[in-house]
Amino acid sequence: MPHQQILMLFGLLPVATNISTWWNFGSMLIACSTLQVLTGFFLAVHYTANINLAFSSIIHITRDVPYGWLMQNLHAIGASMFFICIYIHIARGLYYGSYLNKETWLSGTTLLIMLMATAFFGYVLPWGQMSFWAATVITNLLTAIPYLGTTMTTWLWGGFAINDPTLTRFFALHFILPFGIISMSSLHVMLLHEEGSSNPLGTNSDIDKIPFHPYHTYKDLLMLAAMTTLLLLIVSFSPDIFNDPDNFSKANPLVTPQRIKPEWYFLFAYGILRSIPNKLGGALALTMSIVILLTVPFTHTSKMRSMMFRPFMQMTFWLFAATFMVITWTATKPVEPPFTLIGQAASMIYFLFFISNPIMGWLENKIMKM
């Protein structure tokens, strides 16, 4: 039977014996993606993409639809779990040199951009106060593009301000983009298994591989069980932990919130945007904070793939991870000293990681020759 052959191929997939828990996040992302598509479909059935009814339809789903509260909370918290997993997945790729599999890395970065766009469109759909103002601020950045900016913004809004056509467009985009993500994920997995996974040592795994099943299957299932447990605990006991209090009020274009901020998983990029006082400069920095990941495979100069035996790069990497968290924290604070200065310093260190990567590699090569 064809499905038995597929299962056999999957079970016999050769995998390095020494890949650690950090390699489990790929399968967890597939699980998150499946959860988001399923819960998203059931929510879309009851959602109304109209500025007068959108907020009420979310309340209707939560109160009146059987298990609607569960679908809504699973979808919202599931998005946060998705981003936690994807950030760890990217960090593992940076630490262990997985980016040297160039096609896989480039397709993965494209996936990240698509995922961030999908999450942004989804954040606008409840039409709460923070949804509306976050959409206004972020989409308004398009006007910074010379010549085409104003036309592009008007086209995206469907008019001269955020209104009903904007919500309809965002709902359509939020619905269609996950199918693009599924297609790109399939390509990502195919490109990965063409060359095979790396391992913590960064060495060639061909001499020491075992079938994927049963060892790695159970390893994946353990992490999936842990993630599912955490997800259900948050959904059951603290479903609003990631929500902004302002978003429990219906969107009002006449009242500006004290602090406009997107969801927590965009705060690092928003913090970088805020740290530059110039509009065009901020928009470029925001874009570069994600697009710069595309440069990593082409700037690797070290003779060693993994950072496991590179103490200088390890220090740089953990400084980068700490900087990511600091930028996220500063983005939640008011635009006033000392937060502006901390944000600017942290943003500089964020980009310095990508500049220092090839320099550190070159220095390590020199030291090894001594």
UniProtKB/Swiss-Prot annotation:
The chain crosses the membrane at residues 25-45, 69-90, 105-125, 170-190, 218-238, 280-300, 312-332, 339-358. GO terms for molecular function: metal ion binding; ubiquinol-cytochrome-c reductase activity. GO terms for cellular component: mitochondrial inner membrane; respiratory chain complex III. Coiled coil: none annotated. Its cofactor is heme b. Pfam families: Cytochrom_B_C, Cytochrome_B. Keywords: Electron transport, Heme, Iron, Membrane, Metal-binding, Mitochondrion, Mitochondrion inner membrane, Respiratory chain, Transmembrane, Transmembrane helix, Transport, Ubiquinone. A ubiquinone binds at residue 193. Binds 2 heme b groups non-covalently. It comes from the Eukaryota. The keyword Electron transport applies. The cytochrome bc1 complex contains 3 respiratory subunits (MT-CYB, CYC1 and UQCRFS1), 2 core proteins (UQCRC1 and UQCRC2) and probably 6 low-molecular weight proteins. Belongs to the cytochrome b family. This is Cytochrome b. The gene is MT-CYB.
